[in-house]
Regions:
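Aromatic-lined carbohydrate-recognition surfaces of secreted/lumenal glycan-active proteins
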Residues: 183-188, 216-217, 253, 257-270, ...
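Catalytic and substrate-binding clefts that recognize carbohydrates or anionic sugar/phosphate headgroups
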Residues: 1-180, 188-190, 201-206, 519-521, ...
Length: 604
């Protein structure tokens, strides 16, 4: 470690040097904050130390699942898989042993972002692609170490968290958006081919579900593996499962139901599109010159080279615009992006430098494809991986793969801190899979978990379920024992549409749709709930996150509140316990909200 000394300074410029290392720094007021440009004389690991405010909380760093406040922790700046095998094994095969929930230091993230917001209402953002570690373990300093010197740092401050968020959005635009139809009810995952999809859609409509859309991720085919039913990674309609694709999508549209699909930047080995791309040099290579294959559970796949212009054009024009949007698809999951190997060979660029940027490149390609299509304004896609700048391109993010349980490290509760931290990083519109995704052996979702998750996501920007990796052994929203709850809660989401649209307008300014309890007051000292949230400014939600619970104890933010579905008046700032029968969300609205009349009209 070589400390750099100040060797030259002027009004807005400084130079630091020692031995052969030199960094020139210039400062400029822009975007309502301070841009600090860093120009090193080479590539070298850099450590930046900033004074900390005693007692402050630190939020952000991208999608951090285990807790909101990162003070006392380290955050790794490296895009990675969130889900790992050992916790699943402990919960299932070794379930006779007590399960100890994992700490923050154990848990990776699909979406690290080098933006950090303090409870003192300032934020630091670094423009950097390299691996790094943000160290908040010291009381007197925040220490940022990167494998290469950041290109710049950005400092934002304000008199409220919303003001800081707006300044961050001025520096990196928040271009999140959802078509209005997304808020007309619930998007329910249904797989298995058009006959089954249509049957389930008809059943749900008959049962009173406000069905905004159906999401059929196996539209391109199904691959049954050792872990469950997976998608066949060949991005064109499977004519066996989904025959007469255009006509059947139109038939759903006539019922008022949208159709959603799935894509990722990989192609199953020896599939038709894999062979097409391999022949044209569109797949990423290994150092020996062959195609670099990754293994997904039990099958191999090639990776589309997103640095190769011909491959990018093929993804946009053929896979997205022709094969999906041109055939009536209204939205889709743009999965993955976190797996670029650092030892591969790309058409252009260093994979080690592009690893963190890969999810943003993937989101950018999808956004450009959607916006260049005549139906672009009616279509959205959702991503799970991200990095700095993802908010410029992804229309909405989801929290990735959660376990189908109530554990706070990988289960339903973890999506709340994860969403808060994304919001403090600049990503303002996030949702989760209703019911979770990870299911293995005895790890399967109960009817109770599904309904509690549905209660929560009725109060979110996007209400969408997942069938899990094992649809046949997990309770689904259309199952007879829960469909009445699905119907009631989908109606709640649809009734909130005018308010949710307002929340999405604010998200375009950088203000998160879902916020922690202290966001509006700005007083972090009054923070009591990592597992409750403000939806916009005027709604407070306290999901039930414990199996078997029939009540929820929570402290509401200061002010006068009214409980949804009962009209009980509640004074904020004090801890209280509320009954929570299954299917009845613990949710409140401000008594003086301009939307109070709307909220009072919402019924289960």
């Amino acid at each position: 470690r070589v400390p750099l000394a100040l060797v030259r300074a002027s009004a807005n410029e400084a130079e630091f040097a020692a031995r052969d290392y030199r960094v020139r720094m210039t400062a400029e007021e822009r975007f309502g904050g301070l841009v600090i440009r860093l120009e090193p004389n080479g590539k070298f690991m850099t450590e930046l130390v900033f004074a900390a405010v005693p007692g402050e909380g630190i939020f952000g760093g991208g999608e951090q699942y285990r807790q909101l406040d990162m003070k006392g922790e380290k955050i790794v700046n490296f895009v990675s898989e969130h889900i790992v095998v050992p916790p699943i094994v402990r919960k299932t095969i070794l379930k006779f042993l007590p399960y100890k929930e994992k700490p923050h230091s154990y848990i990776g993230t699909y979406s690290p972002m080098s933006t950090y917001t303090s409870s003192e209402k300032y934020a630091l953002r670094f423009d950097v692609s390299a691996y790094g570690v943000a160290d908040f373990t010291r009381g007197d300093a925040s220490v940022f170490r990167f494998a290469e010197c950041p290109r710049s740092a950005f400092y934002a401050a304000g008199d409220s968290f919303a003001a800081v968020a707006k300044t961050l959005a001025a520096e990196t635009p928040s271009n999140v958006r959802l078509p209005e139809w997304c808020m007309d009810g619930m998007i329910v995952a249904v797989q298995g081919g058009f006959p089954r999809v249509t049957e389930k859609a008809d059943e749900m409509l008959k049962n009173g579900v406000k069905l905004a859309g159906v999401w059929s991720q196996d539209w391109s085919g199904r691959k049954v593996t050792a872990v469950g039913k997976q998608v066949y990674w060949n991005w064109e309609a499977d004519e066996t499962l989904y025959p007469d694709f255009d006509e059947n999508v139109r038939a759903l549209h006539e019922k008022g139901v949208k159709f959603l699909a799935y894509i990722n930047p990989y192609l199953v080995k020896d599939g038709r599109l894999y062979n097409y791309c391999a022949e044209r040099g569109m797949l990423i290579r290994n150092r020996e010159g062959g195609i670099y294959h990754i293994k997904s559970t039990t099958f191999d796949a090639g990776m589309i080279d997103l640095t190769y212009p011909a491959a990018v054009e093929f993804v946009k024009e053929t896979l997205i615009k022709r094969n999906m949007l041109g055939r009536g698809v209204d939205g889709y999951m743009a999965d993955f992006g976190e797996y670029l190997p650092v030892d591969c060979v790309l058409h252009a660029g260093d994979p080690a430098e592009l690893h963190n940027e890969w999810p943003v490149i993937w989101a950018k390609i999808n956004r450009e494809a959607v916006e260049s299509h005549p139906r672009g304004g009616e279509v959205f896609f959702f991503t799970r991986s991200g990095y700095n700048g993802a908010e410029k391109y992804s229309t909405v993010m989801w929290n990735g793969d959660q376990h189908t349980d109530f554990t706070r490290d990988y289960g339903m509760p973890c999506v709340m801190p994860a969403t808060f931290n994304l919001g403090f990083s600049g990503y303002a519109a996030v949702h989760s899979d209703v019911g979770g995704f990870i299911s293995f052996a005895s790890l399967a979702r109960s009817a109770e978990l599904l309904v509690r998750w549905t209660e929560m996501n009725a109060f979110s920007p996007l209400m969408r379920s997942h069938e899990t990796i094992r649809p046949d052994v997990n309770v689904q929203p259309y199952d007879e024992r829960v469909v009445a709850h699905t119907a009631a809660l989908s109606r709640v989401h649809a009734a909130l549409k005018p308010y949710l649209m307002r929340c999405m307008e604010q998200a375009r300014e950088g203000i998160p749709v879902m916020r922690p309890d202290f966001y509006e007051s700005g007083d972090y000292a009054k923070h009591t709930e990592d597992y409750a949230y403000l939806l916009g400014s005027d709604v407070f939600v306290a999901p039930v996150i414990t199996a078997g619970a029939a009540e929820r104890t929570v402290t509401l933010p200061e002010g006068d509140w009214v409980r949804f579905f009962g009209g009980e008046r509640v004074r904020g700032g004090q801890r209280a316990t509320f009954p929570a029968p299954l299917g009845t969300p613990v949710a409140f609205y401000r008594a003086d909200s301009p939307f109070a009349e709307l909220f009072a009209s919402v019924r289960l």
